[in-house]
Amino acid sequence: MSATTPSSHLIFLGTYTKKGSRGIYAVRLDAASGALSAPTLVAETPDPAWLTLSPDKKFLYALHPSPSQAIGYSVTVTPERTSLTPLAIPASAHVPTAPAPAAQPPSHLAVDATGRTLLAANYRDGFVAAIPLGPDGTLSPPTLTWHSGQGTDPQRQASPHPHSVTVSPDNRFVIVCDLGLDRIFSYALTSPNPGAGGLHSPAATLTPGLTPSVATAPGSGPRHFKFSADGRHAYANTEMGGTIEAFTYHAATGALTPLQSISSLPADFTALKSGAEIRIHPNGRFLYTSNRNHDSLAVFALATGTGLLTSVEIVSCGGKTPRNFALSPDGSWLVCAHQDSPDLTVFRVDASTGRLTPTEHRAPVSMCVCVLFYD
């Protein structure tokens, strides 16, 4: 390895703590071989099912079943150890108007580029929270943006279900996929300047964009969202539709124009569709998504000029219910987590074709549902 290439990548793992897992784990991926170290518990906390880092990587935030919506940790990484130290959650950080029960956790988190706002999509209660962050990483009272309405499926879409929050590359907009409404919302993000002499800035504000939302197919359920490497296009996977929706992204207004819809499943698949995660390769040329009920990973070639997708392959994920996966920063490896089988699987990634080759490397983690590369 060169002096600038790490010999291993640190990964944080989020879990559901129902079948033996106890919280957030850390594991290392050998950059040359793809081998995984034994996972170690770094934070004992209930159901940290989504994790995100501050831009400077000093703080990690996890979903938390409390009125604060999330819990923060200071991150310490040395050659000898990796540790997470929980930050205090003051009572003032609690959601002021959350409906009972007031401890419903969100489904997804993101930190804006300034590191001063934590955004949370609350699937169960139907709102998006903008939570101010102090220089010490601690949370303050949020502002809430509520969604209203319903979709076409009376069981799954009787009310709004914001499923993810994604900050635009220029930090001017927040994109929210609402599974319950079959809509993807675009909000202008106003991040206030740090308060003079105060610990926390005022809360950021979310204002509907000039084109406030774009519809997906009825009953499709948009879930997660990613921007292309050049920021000209964007992609959402649909949980209930089993598709990838491609858009032209208009950076000046935050608007999305539908471009393409392509299935992530084989043509002969007739069981319940359940799309999970979506990622774009660091080189910008390939898109990956996971299909839970099919236990597969789908690979697409991404035309950087037009933004259009072409199917490359669909491969077994090597486990059951691939709720989450992530690519290493150098794009050489893909690590897949499984909600219903107790292990991680590792794939070698061909950077020229996007294709995945399974390896023998695994690591035991029960109900792992989030993979977050630290470096």
PLM segments and residue spans:
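Blade-loop segments of beta-propeller domains
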Residues: 38-111, 115
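Surface-exposed loop and turn segments in beta-propeller and other repeat-based domains
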Residues: 89-100, 143-157, 211-214, 259-270, ...
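Residue-level detector of Asp-centered blade-edge/turn motifs that repeat once per structural unit
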Residues: 5-7, 55-57, 113-114, 169-170, ...
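Short loop/turn segments immediately following beta-strands, especially the blade-tip
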Residues: 28-34, 74-82, 131-139, 188-195, ...
